[in-house]
Regions:
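Conserved AMP-binding
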Residues: 5, 84, 138
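Activation segment
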Residues: 3, 26, 35-36, 64, ...
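Conserved AMP-binding/adenylation subdomain of ANL enzymes
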Residues: 1-23
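Short, solvent-exposed helix-helix connector turns and helix-capping sites enriched
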Residues: 9, 39-44, 147-148
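AMP-dependent adenylate-forming
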Residues: 25, 76-79, 94-168
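Gly/Ser/Thr-rich phosphate-binding loop
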Residues: 24-26, 36-106, 110-115, 122
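Alpha-helix capping/helix-boundary segments
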Residues: 30-32, 60, 141
Length: 168
């Protein structure tokens, strides 16, 4: 493990990756970017033991997956998302290359036992490829907020249209 005094030090991460042949990277995109910048600025060799990158917790810059693959073409990149109120990870996109028409890395498809609905301001399903807000449903939903029934009732409710409880 990286000790508390070095948890934001990419040199320390690199040393641990090399020392322990780390195979999985799991972080927010900003930390991954910090590591990639460290490698580039210091002429460090990327440890190809990393076979899987899990990126979540924030928007993933469009160029980041390609930056990773420039170091290791065999690395699998999974972009994850969701809400703390819904099992933290509830949607995933396996990166297979950048499409020129993308404005951003796609949010992905629901993980097993999870559902996503893109709805309008009336809670009606939006047509494919249109904007709306996301409702999350499935086995990963929390019961609600501890000792906050008002917020729980605002954010968690039953959707008659979808015949299930959702998180807004």
């Amino acid at each position: 493990y990286v000790d508390d005094s070095n948890y934001m030090n990419p040199q320390e991460w690199h040393d641990k990756i090399v020392q322990h042949n780390v195979t999985i990277w799991n972080s927010v995109p900003a930390l991954r970017n910090l590591y990639l910048t460290y490698l580039k600025e210091n002429g460090k060799v990327y440890k190809e033991s990393i076979r899987l990158s899990l990126l979540s917790g924030d928007w993933i810059p469009k160029e980041m997956p390609e930056d990773i693959l420039n170091y290791n073409k065999k690395e699998q990149i999974i972009c994850l998302g969701g809400a703390t109120e819904a099992a933290i990870w509830s949607i995933a996109h396996e990166y297979k290359g950048l499409e020129t028409w993308w404005n951003s890395i796609p949010y992905g498809i629901p993980l097993r036992n999870q559902k996503f609905f893109v709805v309008d301001e009336n809670g009606e399903d939006c047509p494919d490829w249109s904007q709306g807000k996301l409702w999350i449903a499935g086995n990963g939903l929390a019961d609600g907020y501890l000792e906050d029934s008002v917020l729980t009732n605002q954010k968690f409710f039953y959707s008659k249209l979808h015949n299930c409880r959702v998180y807004d």
